[in-house]
Regions:
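Membrane-proximal, glycine/serine-rich, low-complexity loop/turn segments characteristic
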Residues: 31-406, 416-428, 584-591, 813-817, ...
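Gram-negative bacterial Sec-dependent N-terminal signal peptides
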Residues: 1-46
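Residue-level detector of intrinsically disordered/flexible regions characterized by low predicted structural confidence
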Residues: 5, 9-10, 72, 103, ...
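Exposed, low-structure sequence patches enriched in small/polar residues
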Residues: 33, 285-287, 292, 395-838
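Hydrophobic alpha-helical elements and their junctions with loops/disorder across both membrane
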Residues: 24-26, 129, 173, 699
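Terminal non-domain segments
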Residues: 4, 17-18, 343, 389-393, ...
Length: 838
């Protein structure tokens, strides 16, 4: 019986839907009414009852009263079918003018369980699709061949457009997602190379260390006190020997600042105006940053006009990658005849500061074009008369020089943290806490780096000399062609370094870095005269090492050493060590330090090729100089809160080189010493500011190394706020009104040698190089720095004889409209405005 029941139930499940379909179809056509037709009455009755298989009980059916379920009959209905039935009937009545009329499909839905509607819909859709397909094929077959082809092409074009639109929409959606992610992601610099406290600054800068890739960032100074000095050398020293025209050769007064960065004899005097791979600043900026700067004598005569221009822009493409462009122009016509100078520097730089990789890349171009006049023939024209400077006779009437430098450089470093050591410790000790942060600086780490530099220096000198003054200037020396000179010199330097830095423990440990590197330096020297060109090549392989560390935030130290193993400069070495103590003694300024520093350096170096062997029309020599020994010891004191900086230095020299009064290179046979002390202190007495710079120096052999014993730069001014913001919290316009004076004790100021491109000694004329002073109005207007200077206002006053010489037989700018200089420095950047005031 059980088996027979299961068979009957199965047949019922199969036959029942078919019977329902037949009954509903017959009912739609008026068949089977009153129990007659295709469907027996028993089956029709079962079909009518089938709509009750899906039920929803009213809410009251689930509630219980005191005596159980509420009284009253609960009716089980198919609410879905009832709802749809009422909607269909209403629509049919509306379409038929109020007469109830159901389509076969709707009448079937009335009879069937709602769970079977999908089967009915699939049959209806299939039937409709078949009819539509048959109608389309009949229409399509009735078309001609040309009409079919046209139709197919139209449909294909529509399909291609639809596909293209679909792909475009997909790409747009993907780009929208990327843009939304980028917009929502904070642009935060994350790098191991700089401290966390500097990563959130709006703008930071640093210089590149080619030896070990270390970075020490700082915030650039954009104040009007810094940009008051429009000549770079005036920011670095009390004063300098120079030729009086912006962009012309410079030699610092302070002997300790004369150390050459490039190491090229004819380029040393031009270094202060341009950049090198070691002095070029790199930047990281949160917003685009641009500097526009102009210093010049707009109202002066065109022949004497000075025009200095500075254009700079930098921007971070990403928080890690920065790109910058620079153009500097210094120059002017000068006071004397034929001393026009044009000094241009262009640079393109990029840097990347990543979590495990840093990179610095750049190109620097410097060109200096200058008319060489050899200075005035007789300085009494300045000391004893008041004639126009253009009427003073000059020494060289037809001479000029041109210097070019092109430098490419690359420095890169890879950080390799030894996280496996920490993981091993954590696996052995469950209580050990391991920090998986990739920027964790307190673990053992290795840094592998490489730096490369390719630099070419060229100098061309030309003159035509036919008078006695010009011949006497060069001691009547014409080795190759009398009366005419065309000398060329070229130095090419290729320096490659590979190093590894090891951080044994933390980046702030007593020994935080241990460094080791190797390098190769290739140099070539070229002399070209109208008769005999020469070329010399040399190569040197060297090793170098270093170490550094700190104790908390109070003591810092570092040491480095370099030794040339093989090659032209074999045996040369350089050792240096630095120490600094930082104390914070000020109760009201906890973060303002008092810094004490010490530096020691000793080096032994071979004289370069041009000092040993040189051939030109006016000078030639072949020397066998011994190595040069230099040892220095310096101490520094810095107290920013007191606006005080001081330093002392001692140097012991042996075998040092100098150019004598004839312009011939010489080597000092006996040891000598240099003692130096400098101080800068600004006194503030209400609105009165007394900014004093003083330099004391002593040279044990003035014939070899002449130095001024005393040099002064005094800037005294009144400072006041001319305008404040509406809320009174910010200074809108700050003004300074005062004078800037220069003076030094009498000394034999060096002379300029145009043929060699160096300063040489002279022992005929003593100079005090002053006093001369500029009267100025200096302003800080919001971000802009603006000044107006009336240069050399005294022009010899209060001395009996004028002495505003900048070098032997060269003068600085004279007063008048030619000395009225206007300067403006304007940085452009965006900065956060903060939350709106409530």
């Amino acid at each position: 019986m059980g088996k027979l029941s299961r068979i009957k139930a199965a047949l019922h499940r199969v036959l029942f839907p078919s019977a329902v379909l037949l009954a509903s179809t017959a009912g739609a056509f008026g068949l089977g009414r009153s129990g007659s037709g295709l469907l027996p009455g028993r089956v029709a009755s079962a079909a009518r009852e089938a709509v009750k298989d899906t039920v929803i009980y009213p809410t009251e059916a689930y509630r219980y009263g005191p005596t159980g379920r509420k009284s009253g009959e609960t009716i089980a209905i198919d609410t879905l079918a009832a709802k749809l039935e009422s909607m269909v009937v209403a629509r049919q009545e509306e379409d038929s003018g109020g007469v109830k009329k159901l389509s076969p499909r709707d009448s079937l839905k009335q009879l069937l369980d709602s769970t079977l509607w999908d089967k009915l819909d699939s049959i209806y859709i299939a039937d409709s699709t078949a009819k539509a397909k048959a109608a389309f094929e009949a229409w399509y077959n009735g078309l001609s061949k040309e009409e079919r082809k046209k139709y197919d092409n139209e449909q294909k074009a529509k399909l291609l457009r639809a596909m293209a639109d679909s792909l475009r929409q997909v790409k747009e959606r993907k780009q929208e997602i990327k843009d939304s992610i980028l917009e929502a992601t904070p642009r935060i610099l994350e790098t191991y190379a700089i401290a966390d406290t500097m990563q959130y600054k709006r703008l930071i800068s640093w210089t590149m260390d080619q030896d070990f890739g270390s970075i020490k960032p700082s915030v650039p100074d954009t104040s009007f006190n810094y940009h008051f000095y429009d000549h770079p050398f005036q920011r670095n020293d009390v004063n300098a020997t120079w030729l009086g025209v912006a962009g012309s050769p410079v030699q610092y007064y302070d002997w300790f600042k004369r150390k050459s960065d490039e190491g090229v004899e004819f380029y040393n005097a031009l270094e202060s105006w341009s950049l090198s791979p070691r002095t070029a600043p790199f930047y990281n900026s949160k917003t685009p940053y641009t500097e526009l700067c102009y210093y010049g004598t707009l109202l002066g005569a065109k022949a004497k006009e000075s025009d200095n221009l500075h254009l700079f822009t930098t921007q971070n493409i990403s928080p890690e990658f920065n790109f910058s462009l620079l153009f500097d122009r210094f120059g002017g016509g000068g006071m004397l005849d034929r001393e026009q100078t044009i000094n241009k520097t262009s640079s393109v730089q990029a840097n990347y500061l990543g979590k495990k990789y840093t990179m610095h890349f750049g190109y620097i171009h410097n060109m200096v074009s200058r008319q060489e006049n050899g200075g005035m023939q007789d300085i009494s024209w300045i000391r004893d008369t008041t004639v126009d400077a253009r009427d003073i006779p000059i020494t060289l009437k037809n001479a000029d020089s041109k210097v070019k430098k092109n430098s490419f450089f690359l420095e890169q470093q890879l950080r390799v943290p030894f996280t496996f050591i920490e993981k091993m410790k954590a696996s052995r000790d469950s209580s050990y806490s391991f920090n998986p942060d990739s920027l964790n600086r307190d673990i053992t780490t290795a840094f592998i780096g490489h730096s490369s530099e390719i630099t070419t220096y060229t100098r061309n000198y030309n003159d035509v000399i036919s008078d006695e003054a010009g011949r006497n200037f060069y001691n009547n020396a014409f080795f190759y062609e009398p009366g005419r000179t065309a000398d060329s010199s070229r130095v090419r330097k290729i320096d490659n370094k590979l190093y590894i830095r090891l951080q044994p423990w933390s980046s702030e440990a007593v020994v935080s870095k241990l460094d080791l590197g190797v390098g190769d330096l290739y140099r070539s020297y070229f002399d070209s005269t109208s008769v005999r060109p020469t070329l010399h090549k040399e190569n040197t392989f060297y090793i170098y090492a270093g170490a550094e560390g700190q104790i908390r935030e109070n003591f810092f130290w570092d040491a480095r050493g370099k030794y040339n193993l093989i090659g032209y400069d074999a045996g040369d070495f350089n050792l240096s060590a630095n120490g600094e103590i930082k104390l914070y003694p000020f109760r009201k300024a906890r973060k303002s330090p008092l810094s004490l520093g010490v530096n020691f350096e000793t080096r032994l170096e071979n004289p370069n090729w041009y000092t040993q062997h040189y051939n030109s029309n006016h000078f030639k020599w072949d020397n066998e100089f011994s190595k040069i020994s230099t040892s220095t010891l310096q101490g520094t004191l810095s107290v920013p809160r007191w606006k005080l900086d001081a330093s002392v230095g001692y140097a012991l020299l042996a075998g040092n080189l100098y150019y004598d009064t004839q312009g011939i290179i010489r080597q000092n046979d006996s040891p000598m010493s240099v003692l130096s002390a400098s101080i800068r202190k600004e006194f503030v007495l209400g609105p009165l500011h007394l900014d004093n710079k003083l330099l004391l120096q002593y040279s044990s052999n003035q014939e070899v190394l002449p130095l001024p014993n005393l040099s002064l730069n005094l800037r005294y001014f009144l400072q006041f706020v001319a305008q404040k913001s509406d809320d009174g919290l910010r200074d809108i316009l700050v003004m300074q009104l005062g004078a800037n004076a220069f003076y030094n004790s009498a000394w034999y100021s060096p002379a300029w040698n145009p043929a060699l491109g160096v300063f040489q000694n002279q022992n005929e004329r003593l100079y005090t190089n002053g006093p001369y002073f500029d009267v100025f109005l200096n302003m800080q207007w919001k971000r802009a720095c603006i000044f107006v200077k009336f240069q050399n206002a005294g022009q010899g006053w209060p001395m009996n004889k004028s002495d505003y010489f900048s070098a032997d037989r060269y003068i600085v700018t004279q007063r008048g409209f030619s000395g009225l200089k206007i300067g403006i420095y304007w940085p452009f950047y965006m900065e956060p405005t903060g939350h709106p005031a409530k």
